[in-house]
Amino acid sequence: MENRIFIRMVGAMLLLCVVFTAFHGSERRIRTTIDDAFKYAVEKDFQNRKLYLTRNAASNIRYGVRDYALSPSFDRKIVNYSLRTPTGIHTYQFKDSISEETAKRFLTQHLLEKVHRLNPNHVKKLFLERLEEKEIDAQVGVLCLRDTVRHWSDADSVVPKNVYSTPRQVLDITGKIKVQAWADYSVGTV
């Protein structure tokens, strides 16, 4: 009799371990999908704002912004990037060498912020669309930090407790513009 009870207990513990492992793996996959969906939304917003430069007349765009944002980048590593402005030449120095394409993306984000700012509501909409494509049902919010000023999607600064927050992404060359999202998904999604 004791042998049967022991076997049932071991079986139950093994079943619990399998269920826990499957649940934990599913949650990790969902969080990875949420991170990827947010990166996609930020990238798509960047491309949409960059497209804004090509559609507007040069008189609407500040000095040199269009030239820098739309010029090609080369496949090489750089340690600094120079920008000509009406007040002179500004040089941005990097700690390590980075690809010119990455530096150009950071610079373009910085310049776009002056003519067509990132809108957390638009990023949130793109984020939700991507999550729906991936069949993840969640409440989400987006935070954009400009220096120390916080801009929330839907002007809502209340984040529910126990939600998943994506890693904060630095967008511009100065490191002053950052975005982050949170997602509150149900256990049924896992």
What are these regions (language model features)?
Residues 18, 28-186:
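The feature marks either
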Residues 13-20, 190:
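Single-pass alpha-helical transmembrane signal-anchor segments
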